Amino acid sequence: MQFLPKADPEIFAALKKEDERQENNLEMIASENFVSRAVLEAYTSTLTNKYAEGYPGKRYYNGCHNADIVESLAIERAKELFGAEYANVQPHSGAQANMAVFLACLEPGDSFLGMNLAHGGHLTHGSPVNVSGRIYKPIPYGVDSKTETIDYDEIAKLAREHKPKLIVAGASAYARTIDFSKFAEIAKEVGAKLMADIAHISGLVSTGYHPSPVGLFDFVTTTTHKTLRGPRGGLILSTLENEKVLNSRVFPGIQGGPLMHVIAAKAVAFKEALQPEYKKYIEIVLANAKTLAEVFLKRGYRVVSGGTDNHLVLLDVSVKGLTGVQAADGLDEVGVTVNKNAIPFDKNPPAVASGIRLGTPALTTRGLKPADMETVGNLICDFLDNPNEEKNKKRVKGGVQEITRKFPMDQFRLD
């Protein structure tokens, strides 16, 4: 960095420390990833200076010719990537994308079905602390107590009973394949609209490693980071018949000017995801996650639902007498970054939790393969087996540092 150290040494120091944290720790938060230098360059471009309210060819400001080119490329690439008729690349986040869809098909007080946050859903799917649970009437569905997989019979029963206007499929802490076709059958029976939130699995969907809801559902939303390896942002996919209402719900409905530098970075990420190498990347993400789950099972830990079909693993640490917060904080001390997470039918409050959520996208981007992930999994188990012994913590931290030195982060920095 050339100018920041002098202009704002405090911010510069914090950014350098963050570089060091990412370099010296194993990033295993399932919703995080590392963007390429090309994405980072687009993100830090002079497009951050440009206001471009409206849409390509229909702006409220002059001087938007280049912004139009950028947004049009992002739209076309998103449509190609997911096989969609329509794409809106302006949402600032996945939460904004979800809210735009709600505004497009629901009125205040209308009921909708969404996955229970405590069972792996997302707070924007009807949590009482979120606007989705305050303006509308959410009806939560969950997982089966024995299999810990989505209970489609319960969804059908709730749909018949409540006749919701919208059914939301998608999760933030669910490791199994989602059967979108079953959701479609249920929605058709009760006359409900369908929204799929594929924020976590969009990379798997775009490469064919998870069934796609595009063309089957009325609306599909996603973030552009996580498995897509783009900047933090949102995306809406739908059919052309919904273009007018969705565009108006994003702008001027819930947003003003789009973040054009972010949209430029989204366009770059979409182009990267259209390349053959990206499909190979997702293949390794999945192999790494399966390896991680297998290590945990072999070491006597309980993996929620018994394994994984995607990029994440939900681990029940209560079997070792730990809470999620104890496990996550302890792992952080030895250089492994995860997050505490509730597990289905958790007896602990969310702020404490009984589980941790681990993901493989970031480490796969960094270059780790299944053999490396086996080592990582064993290091995690070594720590959790004896989290309070200083000698054990020191040994595990040394193992983590061996891996981070083997896979440096230079390729993800601009300087």
UniProtKB/Swiss-Prot annotation:
SUPFAM superfamilies for the chain: PLP-dependent transferases (SSF53383)
Annotated positions binding (6S)-5,6,7,8-tetrahydrofolate: 117, 121-123
Cofactor(s) annotated in UniProt: pyridoxal 5'-phosphate
Reactions catalysed according to its record: (6R)-5,10-methylene-5,6,7,8-tetrahydrofolate + glycine + H2O = (6S)-5,6,7,8-tetrahydrofolate + L-serine
Record-listed E.C. numbers: 2.1.2.1
Listed pathway(s): One-carbon metabolism; tetrahydrofolate interconversion; Amino-acid biosynthesis; glycine biosynthesis; glycine from L-serine: step 1/1
EC primary class: transferase
The protein's name in its UniProt record: Serine hydroxymethyltransferase
Upper taxonomic lineage: Bacteria, Pseudomonadati, Spirochaetota, Spirochaetia, Leptospirales
